């Protein structure tokens, strides 16, 4: 069959290409239905990545957050029409120690490999996780981002000491909101503190016990463990603030992505005996746990619906441009594309 793939060939330039695919393989064929734009996609779309990176990664189809319906499954795992979340990480080897999302040989969609802006996506059955029938598809569209926070939480549970009375979350954006929400549900008795720089964003964190502007943190604030969800150059200040306020022997999870190296106060990391770990991307197991959390705590999807800042029907390439340009103006929330190509 001929599959149409909508590739970014240069910043703000998307073209359709044609890819001949066979149905006589072990791949499940999925028709995308709802996709969500990520900051990483925007960096490619706007050309804010380095010229070297763009030359290496483009052309490629963007988007690694999305759901779709199964059209054909030779494995018999999914019935035709089943709504599934697509896992963008594609490992090429197995390792007993290193997780598939940390293997340097793994391929990640919309990062040098075609993402979900296609008529049909071809994936192995183990790259798909069924979506609950009653889940809002606009929320399900960015399940991948939620699974990233779930992955960080799963790693935390293995690394951190068991005194989990107070948590601090730095970052008032989408990832900070999701991470804080998960902590609220998984540790309902713990005190949840959120730190950010924009009051209008902090107002969304109604489930937190306390919210603080990063320039107005009381001297007596403290917490057992912290999660950095800032990214960019701002992650430097967030990490160092966390180091200042965290109780000794606490654990710090770093989730924010920065293009540049940042300076952190290693002296106090040593002095306080802190555990610092990085967390990136996710696995099918994280997607599965995310779906379980959606069903165990129905108010999680309800809260996440507050992140849907705009929904665009995509019927032509110009609609993709409109969605991306609109997303650039959003200070908070996720832009969702209903894929009708």
Go through each PLM region and give its residues.
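NAD(P)H dinucleotide-binding glycine-rich loop of Rossmann-like/cofactor-binding domains
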Residues: 90-166
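Glycine-rich cofactor phosphate-binding loops and adjacent beta1-alpha1 units
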Residues: 158-165, 186-187, 202-274
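C-terminal hydrophobic helical "lid"/dimerization subdomain
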Residues: 3, 284-341
């Amino acid at each position: 069959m001929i599959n149409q793939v909508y590739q970014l060939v240069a910043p703000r330039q998307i073209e359709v290409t044609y890819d001949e695919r066979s149905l006589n393989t072990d791949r499940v064929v999925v028709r995308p239905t709802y996709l969500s734009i990520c900051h990483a996609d925007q960096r490619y779309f706007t050309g804010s990545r380095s010229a070297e990176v763009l030359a290496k990664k483009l052309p490629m189809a963007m988007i690694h957050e999305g759901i779709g319906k199964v059209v054909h499954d030779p494995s018999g795992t999914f019935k035709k029409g089943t709504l599934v979340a697509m896992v963008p990480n594609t490992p090429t080897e197995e390792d007993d120690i290193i997780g598939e999302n940390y293997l340097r040989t793994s391929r990640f969609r919309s990062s040098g490999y075609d993402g979900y802006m296609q008529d049909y996506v071809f994936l192995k059955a183990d790259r798909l996780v069924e979506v609950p029938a009653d889940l809002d598809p606009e929320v399900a569209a960015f399940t991948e981002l939620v699974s990233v926070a779930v992955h960080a939480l799963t790693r935390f549970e293995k690394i951190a000491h068991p005194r989990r009375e107070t948590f601090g979350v730095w970052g008032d954006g989408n990832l900070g909101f999701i991470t804080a929400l998960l902590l609220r549900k998984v540790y309902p008795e713990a005190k949840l503190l959120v730190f950010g720089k924009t009051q209008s964003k902090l107002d969304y964190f109604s489930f937190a016990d306390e919210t603080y502007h990063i320039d107005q943190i009381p001297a007596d604030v403290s917490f057992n463990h912290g999660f950095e969800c800032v990214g960019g150059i701002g992650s430097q200040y967030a990490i160092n603030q966390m180091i200042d306020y965290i109780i000794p022997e606490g654990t710090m999870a770093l989730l924010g992505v920065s293009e540049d190296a940042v300076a952190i106060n290693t002296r106090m990391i040593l002095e306080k005996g802190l555990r610092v770990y990085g967390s990136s991307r996710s696995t099918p197991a994280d997607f599965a746990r995310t779906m379980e959390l959606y069903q165990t705590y129905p108010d999680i999807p309800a809260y996440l619906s507050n992140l849907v800042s705009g929904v665009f029907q995509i019927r032509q390439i110009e609609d993709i441009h409109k969605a991306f340009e609109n997303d650039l103006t959003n200070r908070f929330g996720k832009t969702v594309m209903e894929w009708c190509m």
